[in-house]
Swiss-Prot record:
This is GTPase Der. The keyword Repeat applies. InterPro entries: G_ENGA (IPR031166), GTP-bd (IPR006073), GTPase_Der (IPR016484), KH_dom-like (IPR032859), KH_dom-like_a/b (IPR015946), P-loop_NTPase (IPR027417), Small_GTP-bd (IPR005225). HAMAP family: GTPase_Der (MF_00195). Residues 352-436 form the KH-like domain. The keyword Repeat applies. The gene is der. Keywords: GTP-binding, Nucleotide-binding, Repeat, Ribosome biogenesis. It comes from the Bacteria.
Amino acid sequence: MAKPVVAIVGRPNVGKSTIFNRIVGERVSIVEDVPGVTRDRIYNSAEWLGKEFNIIDTGGIDLSDEPFLEQIRAQAEIAIDEADVIIFITNGREGVTDADEQVAKILYRSNKPIVLAINKVDNPEMRDQIYDFYSLGFGEPYPISGSHGLGLGDMLDAVRAHFPKEEEEEYPDDTVKFSLIGRPNVGKSSILNALLGEDRVIVSDIAGTTRDAIDTTYTFDGQDYVMIDTAGMRKRGKVYESTEKYSVLRAMRAIERSDVVLVVINAEEGIREQDKRIAGYAHDAGRAIIIVVNKWDAINKDEKTINVWTEDIREQFQFLSYAPIVFVSAKTKQRLNNLFPLINQVSDNHSLRVQSSMLNDVISDAVAMNPSPMDKGKRLKIFYTTQVAVKPPTFVVFVNDPELMHFSYERFLENRIREAFPFEGTPIRVIARKRK
């Protein structure tokens, strides 16, 4: 099941980004120091009382070309469309403003749970000023201070109470769930329609457990699949449609419910920063990934074109070095018949468990070939390695001191594991822990 989505909404200068950063905390930091992993600060993962959720800072979406009220309306629309719970931020120092009332009118029609928070209530004396905010019609307001971190616990308790009840996926374990993600107009819908052609047995179109998503279930060559639609493939005409950052938000839920993610790139437009943002989220979520270059029929080519494109993709998506690349045309159906076998392959690799004895032989040989460097007179000592999870395959390396496991050596071990076992298409995790 996808994580609940929480959106932070409010007029400018009420402190939305400060509260966003407070809630996500250290999760804002870049996890991997690899070129090409682009972070977008408008969304992130957070956790409260053991429950993980995604949080959107609508104020981070660039709508500077729009009139003021249109910006507010666009933020509210994004929250209404995407969120399970909305945090409505106001400013306690300024009281209720006309802009607050404009936001309230839009949110009030949403039928979504609204948690009203009054920011910049930095001392107890200011709490007497909160009563005016009852007029906005969202019940008890929560006085908070984003800059000092005050009151956030009570606010998050209220947010968590509104999370939807968890539902189990209704599909058998051997069903492969995949999604096509990408910027607007890269051809996701065209690929989907071409895939659901005459050779496919379409079982049903049913509403998914995630709001506004359609799960298309079908069978091909005896294998059951679920194509998890991003809502953006079926909805058009919103005021924020031209805002490319928004395509990341639409992809988040589909990615989390998928086993395999097909990152679709438009060959006519080339690789854009937004392609890397979307792919980075799928990578961070630990999903199996295939890079699909669509509209291959629409560009001029010679015998070197595929190699040039492949080199460019490998350079710009260095964090996806494991992902296979397929050049397709939804229009002519060129190479589309390669997609299902590849989806099956990377799905199998995503779930692969390796024997501990073979794994430890690989690690021992790697250490013998390239011992870890000394650090302040100490050397990393590896005692043993075990696989602790799949989807993605995750390995714990028990060592004398995890601080001695440098990122470069961790990457070296990952590469040796990849050389020894079939992990094409899936990220793998290598974690150092101190042996007890």
